[in-house]
Curated annotation (Swiss-Prot):
This is Contact site B protein C. It comes from the Eukaryota. The gene is csbC. Belongs to the csb family. It holds the Pfam family Dicty_CAD. One of its GO terms (cellular component) is extracellular matrix.
Amino acid sequence: MAELKITLINEDGESTISGKAHPAPTPRILPTPYFMSFTEYKIEGKLWDKKEFHIKSGKIEFNGKEFDIPESQGTWIKDNVEIIIRIFLSQQANKPFSLDF
C-alpha cells in the first residue's frame, strides 16, 4: 500500500480522496483505466454523493509526482473496509500513472 491522493473536477467542483491505496483488478482495455482501492481514506467534495460521475479533469499525486487525468467517466463502490475508485479514461493520459506500487 502507498499514500495516494486523487483530485477530480466535475460540474460539482473539486473533490478529493486520499489515503492508503493499492491497485484493484483492471480490465485489459485501452486506454488503460485506473482502478484503485483505498483504505484509511478521507474524502472531500460533492462528487462522492453520486455512484457514477463525469470527470472534466483531475490528477493523481503519488510519491511527490503528479499525473494528469483527462476527461473520463468514473464510478466508486464501498464496503466496510475500503472504497474502490474506477476511472475510465476517454483518451490515454499524456503522462500515464503506473499502478505498480
